[in-house]
Amino acid sequence: MPILVVNVDHVATLRQQRLGIEPDPVTAAHMAELAGARGIIVHLREDRRHIQDRDVSLLRQTLKTRLHLEMAATEEMQGIALAEKPHMVCLVPEKREELTTEGGLVVAGRVDFLQAYVKPFHEIGIATSLFIEADPDQIRAAARVGVTHVELHTGHFADAPDAAERKRQRDAIVAGIGLARTLGLKVNLGHGLNYDNIFDFEAVPGICEFSIGHSIVSRAVLTGFGPAVRDMVDIINRFPG
């Protein structure tokens, strides 16, 4: 059965609008755990636009479940991750001008670099993942890197302008899940998933985790963080294993 990992970046986005201390993404993460989330994910960006270094430290010290750290493949971020020791590191592309991560990491052509980059994490027991498109070339390259997981980008599916394109994107993701599994990779899905479109993956085997943030934070503004997380947990818990 897939599990829910909650991204609390946008709680930090709201906090940073006033450069204040609230709302606190660490508190939100604890509430998510109490509501049934099986892990927390944060993206420590190079420009520190939402999550801050202190947030990562506090989350690592206080979470009862798991911390997944999204980050760019830079020397600075590698040092932070090796010091904090999250349960998983997920490498993502990063552009300063983007509002949110716009697409998957290009792995093909960078296999040697990424192999060397993730090696120190494996040596101390940190799981590794690459946020990639559901493209066969990228999935095969990810397998050559030797990561334990891939997270397939669902943003193009979520943003599809019509039913035909949405089906095309879903079919590509489902095929990508199958290919990744045959290559020995564990598969997570994330980006743009919400309380409605997640049902398109209800009967798809082989999904380990759904990484969901924005839609949960959006609902939480109206219903509270605990109920918003619980609603998503209840949906995912109905999915077959």
From Swiss-Prot:
Keyword Cytoplasm: yes
One GO biological process term: pyridoxine biosynthetic process
Record EC number: 2.6.99.2
Positions marked as site (Transition state stabilizer): E151
Binding site for 1-deoxy-D-xylulose 5-phosphate: D9, H10, R45, H50, T100
GO cellular component annotations of the record: cytosol
Role description: Catalyzes the complicated ring closure reaction between the two acyclic compounds 1-deoxy-D-xylulose-5-phosphate (DXP) and 3-amino-2-oxopropyl phosphate (1-amino-acetone-3-phosphate or AAP) to form pyridoxine 5'-phosphate (PNP) and inorganic phosphate.
Catalytic residues (positions): H43, E70, H191
Keyword Cytoplasm annotated: yes
Protein species of origin: Nitratidesulfovibrio vulgaris (strain ATCC 29579 / DSM 644 / CCUG 34227 / NCIMB 8303 / VKM B-1760 / Hildenborough) (Desulfovibrio vulgaris)
Record protein name field: Pyridoxine 5'-phosphate synthase
Residues that coordinate or bind 3-amino-2-oxopropyl phosphate: N7, R18, G192, G213, H214
The protein's annotated pathway: Cofactor biosynthesis; pyridoxine 5'-phosphate biosynthesis; pyridoxine 5'-phosphate from D-erythrose 4-phosphate: step 5/5
Keywords for this protein: Cytoplasm, Pyridoxine biosynthesis, Transferase
Chemical reaction(s) catalysed: 3-amino-2-oxopropyl phosphate + 1-deoxy-D-xylulose 5-phosphate = pyridoxine 5'-phosphate + phosphate + 2 H2O + H(+)
EC main group: transferase
Subunit (UniProt): Homooctamer; tetramer of dimers.
Compartments, as annotated in UniProt: Cytoplasm
Encoding gene (name): pdxJ
HAMAP family assigned to the protein according to its UniProt record, in alphabetical order: PdxJ (MF_00279)
GO molecular function terms noted in the UniProt entry: pyridoxine 5'-phosphate synthase activity
Family in the record: Belongs to the PNP synthase family.
Pfam families named in the record: PdxJ (PF03740)
